[in-house]
Amino acid sequence: MIGGLFIYNHKGEVLISRVYRDDIGRNAVDAFRVNVIHARQQVRSPVTNIARTSFFHVKRSNIWLAAVTKQNVNAAMVFEFLYKMCDVMTAYFGKISEENIKNNFVLIYELLDEILDFGYPQNSETGALKTFITQQGIKSQHQTKEEQSQITSQVTGQIGWRREGIKYRRNELFLDVLESVNLLMSPQGQVLSAHVSGRVVMKSYLSGMPECKFGMNDKIVIEKQGKGTADETGKTGKQSIAIDDCTFHQCVRLSKFDSERSISFIPPDGEFELMRYRTTKDIILPFRVIPLVREVGRTKLEVKVVIKSNFKPSLLAQKIEVRIPTPLNTSGVQVICMKGKAKYKASENAIVWKIKRMAGMKESQISAEIELLPTNDKKKWARPPISMNFEVPFAPSGLKVRYLKVFEPKLNYSDHDVIKWVRYIGRSGIYETRC
């Protein structure tokens, strides 16, 4: 399994080092530094093989985490461990930085001792780890036998992600549906490719060991598994979404999801990601960009861009930014926009148009005259696509939360006693229109 774990700063200095197998030596540390961190060309692959040794690495800010092995391991499992390790460190001391790692190096070694056992990942659930590993170290001397038995049952039991005895004065549940819509559109308005990547993030402040049930859009259609079809959902008369693939938090009972298409679970305490999904059909495109580029001789371009919002008039889009690329030999730009502010940025070779807010079913436009320097280059301007950033208060996939129910029979509180909040946020991913 994992032979060793090393954490480096941007200079290649080792901040944390833990070796689990005898076949990993000091030369592995230097090999990664020379071939990856100090490489002449940027290393794009997350897996690097050097002298029959595999280095699985991720980067957070200026910090490198590298898992090293000489065995044929499951790559997905190693990366899942590395990302989990990043999440655990973030939960304990916030931002992953060189200063924070140096200030908490004892804590990190304690966490590694619990998370990895002889190179095999064991327990990476933050809630369980926080019961006996704190910022001050392992709480062992002042614990009663009862507290120690609770920790043991949580770590080794079926519900390792939640401890017993949690109590809140007010029971609250926050649900965020966060989506990123990606688009590539032709100049004529034809959709060349589009997909939505979504996450359902939950913040749970519930007493006891509550049972939660979560439902969306009548039914989820998982096409690849073939367990639901569009015809099946059409009988209900309600719109449903077709999800291409999805993954769930370990607390979700997958057997019930397969048989009943209901998401039931006992949630961890605090914030966690309930599910992640991807869809490519029936996407609501929040904006359409209509470009018009006209060449006036060899030293002038006229550009006109219209953006149209395609959602309900009662909703407001925010943080709108349109980037219109310009040729490398641009000497000057004159811009006129109906709404917002526009500025030519020579360092980025682009006109950046910003609008604070825009209601649904509206349109706005920008016109620009671009002066060009004479050039001997016979190659035509490639016309890079116009890109757009925005944030809208709905899910572009069409996903809607139908119900969110909570049951806690032991503490005698019901679904009506829980305060629930649901929020939808749609953001642009790579949202481009060719011109």
Curated annotation (Swiss-Prot):
GO cellular component, one term: clathrin adaptor complex
Known function: Component of the adaptor complexes which link clathrin to receptors in coated vesicles. Clathrin-associated protein complexes are believed to interact with the cytoplasmic tails of membrane proteins, leading to their selection and concentration. AP50 is a subunit of the plasma membrane adaptor. The complex binds polyphosphoinositide-containing lipids.
Gene Ontology MF annotations: lipid binding
CDD domains linked to this entry: AP-2_Mu2_Cterm, AP2_Mu_N
Identification of the protein by name: AP-2 complex subunit mu
Gene Ontology biological process terms in this record: endocytosis; intracellular protein transport
Quaternary data: Adaptor protein complex 2 (AP-2) is a heterotetramer composed of two large adaptins (alpha-type subunit and beta-type subunit), a medium adaptin (mu-type subunit) and a small adaptin (sigma-type subunit).
Highest taxon listed in the record's lineage: Eukaryota
Localization (cell): Cell membrane; Membrane, Coated pit
Pfam families the UniProt entry points to: Adap_comp_sub, Clat_adaptor_s
Disulfide bonds: none
Membrane topology of this protein: Peripheral membrane protein
Annotated SUPFAM superfamilies: Second domain of Mu2 adaptin subunit (ap50) of ap2 adaptor, SNARE-like
Keyword Membrane: yes
Family the entry assigns: Belongs to the adaptor complexes medium subunit family.
Domain MHD: 170-434
Record's keyword terms, sorted: Cell membrane, Coated pit, Endocytosis, Lipid-binding, Membrane, Protein transport, Transport
Binding site for a 1,2-diacyl-sn-glycero-3-phospho-(1D-myo-inositol-3,4,5-trisphosphate): 341, 345, 354
